[in-house]
């Protein structure tokens, strides 16, 4: 006997009924059925909708840690084995670390919270020890199945004001995301800090699986052994929105060193505020993406004059010197040579006066890139009738 009920609710019959249970093999002898597993149904449904497949039983899941400020570097310690590996054909699991909308700092082995720091302190070695296929710090990634099911978005109810990777801290995973959502704050990597994905294995999933990342009103720094397609961030408000991305800032302890960013697939910086790539930064990757509110292309002196007059739109300044710095990939630590530079603008590309962006190496006569990709809803040119803007 049994009671009929609605699954997941407290609604059920008061009276018991007679229930007959028939084994599946016996039932198949009584009639003929077209049977399909959940995984096969989900794959077929996703193909019909033209979107990536949903989560399947072969996929590993996510571990989410929501930490409170004031606990010091000893608030999180991990000396175990994380089981984030997927079954064959599945997506690897993720480690998601949140700071209860506080500031987050990540320090090196044995280090304590920085003097005067008010926020969540974590040691990089403890985060690396989980062995996750994807490490996300500052927000929770989500994919809503159905229309728009190819967008990886981030939960608007959680976030971090800022994230700083201190001197001596190195994050290592197949894929690392840092996200912050407070204007006036920053995602900062000090001199001597590093994010390295080389030799860590495959990312959980990437653009080749049909996914597109949308950071929303957040700044984002990401390194991956896969291919990342990233939309520009949305415009924020005075209290919530993208902040700066500062790579290679002087260390709080005064110790100088190189900031290292190495991946086998992609390096992405997304913000509509300041983006600083200091001379101390060494990076190597196959695909470099800058996603910004806009790009202002022209000589630095002219752009500075326009900004002083208050007529320069918000955006990242770009000239030949900046382009040359972006093309200085470093393959000395085993990273692949740079192949693709992607510049995605939310608003527009603005060209001022006579300007040229040249990817060719003067010594060899060959382009330092296989692909230069510009993504923008509009391209504007400002100058007189003789002004020429060129990209080569």
Which sequence ranges carry the predicted segments?
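Extracellular and secretory-pathway beta-repeat/beta-biased strand scaffolds
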Residues: 1-392
């Amino acid at each position: 006997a049994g009671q009929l009920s609605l699954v997941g609710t407290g609604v059920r019959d008061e009276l018991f009924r007679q229930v007959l249970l028939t084994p599946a093999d016996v039932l198949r002898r009584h009639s003929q059925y077209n049977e399909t597993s959940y995984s096969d149904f989900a794959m077929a449904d996703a193909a019909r909708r033209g979107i990536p497949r949903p989560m399947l039983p072969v996929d590993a899941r996510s571990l989410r840690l929501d930490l409170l400020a004031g606990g010091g570097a000893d608030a999180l310690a991990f000396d175990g084995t994380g089981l984030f590996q997927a079954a064959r054909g599945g997506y690897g699991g993720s480690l998601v670390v949140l700071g209860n909308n506080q500031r987050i700092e990540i320090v090196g082995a044995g280090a304590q919270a920085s003097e005067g720091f008010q926020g969540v302190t974590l040691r990089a070695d403890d985060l690396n020890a989980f062995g996750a296929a994807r490490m996300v710090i500052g927000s929770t990634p989500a994919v809503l199945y159905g229309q728009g099911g190819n967008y990886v978005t981030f939960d608007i109810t959680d976030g971090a004001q800022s994230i700083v990777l201190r001197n001596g801290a190195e994050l290592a995973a197949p894929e690392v995301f840092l996200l912050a959502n407070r204007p006036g704050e920053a995602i900062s990597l000090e001199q001597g800090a590093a994010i390295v994905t080389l030799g860590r294995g495959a990312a959980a999933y990437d653009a080749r699986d049909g996914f597109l990342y949308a950071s929303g009103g957040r700044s984002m720094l990401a390194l991956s052994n896969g291919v990342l397609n990233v939309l520009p961030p949305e415009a924020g408000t005075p209290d919530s929105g993208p902040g700066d991305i500062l790579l290679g800032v002087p260390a709080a302890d005064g110790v100088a060193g190189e900031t290292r960013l190495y991946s086998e697939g992609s390096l992405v910086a997304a913000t509509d505020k300041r983006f600083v790539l200091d001379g101390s930064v060494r990076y190597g990757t196959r695909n470099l993406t800058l996603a910004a509110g806009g790009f202002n292309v022209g000589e630095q002196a002219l752009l500075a004059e326009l900004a002083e007059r208050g007529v320069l739109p918000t955006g990242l300044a770009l000239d030949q010197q900046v382009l040359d710095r972006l093309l200085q990939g470093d393959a000395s630590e085993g990273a692949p040579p740079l192949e693709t530079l992607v510049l995605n603008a939310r608003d527009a590309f603005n060209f001022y006066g006579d300007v040229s962006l040249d990817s060719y190496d003067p010594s060899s006569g060959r382009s330092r890139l296989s692909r230069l990709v510009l993504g923008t809803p509009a391209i504007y040119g400002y100058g007189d009738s003789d002004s020429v803007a060129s990209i080569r």
